[in-house]
Amino acid sequence: MLAQQFPEGIRMSIFAHKLVGGNGGADLQGINILNHYIGMREIRAQDFPEMKFIPFALGLFFLLGLRTAVFARVHQLVDLLVLFIYFGLFSLVAFYYRMYTFGHQLSPEAAFKVPPFTPPVFGHQHIANFDVYSYPGLGTYLLSAYALVLGVLLVIEARRKAPAAVPVNRVAAA
C-alpha cells in the first residue's frame, strides 16, 4: 500500500502457511491500526484456517505428481490436472470472498467512513487515500508452472498413446 504519509509503502505478504508484515512485522501492525480507523477487523493468521491445510494439500499434489510421473497413465494425468485446477479455483474464490468480507463488514462506529470495498486479489485499486497493489509471488508462479507441466504432459501422453491413423486407399469404381 502506498500513500502520501507512507512514501516507502506498507507491505504484507500472504503465503500458503503464514502472513508476514514488511519491516520486521511492523507493517502488518500498521495495516491493522489503519484498518481499525475505517472499521475493518484485524488481519490475523488465525482467521485464515486454510493456512493449516494448504501446505499439506500442496505436498499431496507433489506426491500425486510423482506417482503420476512414475506410472504415466493418461487418466491419472487428467485426474490430477482437474483436481489441481479445482483446488486453484477454489483457493482464488475463497481468497476473494475473504477480501470481500474484510472490506464489506465495516463497523458503523469507525472513526473514518469509507464506502464498502473489496481489496484487490490481483492488480491495483485506489482505496481512500491509498493505492493498494496485490500481485502474485513466487509460489503462485511455481503452482502455475506445475499446472502447465501437467497440461503439457497430458498432451504428450495422449498423443503417444493415440492409435496411429491408418491411411485409406480409395479405389475408383470402374
Locate each region found by the language model.
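Extended alpha-helical regions
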Residues: 51-62, 77, 160-174
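Membrane-water interface of alpha-helical transmembrane segments
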Residues: 48, 74-81, 130-140
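Long, glycine/tryptophan/cysteine-rich extracytoplasmic
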Residues: 1-49, 96-134
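Structural signature of transmembrane alpha-helix termini at the membrane-water interface
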Residues: 66-70, 93-100, 152-162
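Alpha-helical transmembrane segments of secretory-pathway, organelle, and plasma-membrane proteins
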Residues: 1-8, 83, 87-89, 94, ...
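Terminal transmembrane helical module of multi-pass membrane proteins
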Residues: 104-174
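Interfacial segments of alpha-helical transmembrane regions
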Residues: 65-91, 166-167
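Hydrophobic alpha-helical transmembrane segments
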Residues: 49-68, 141-151
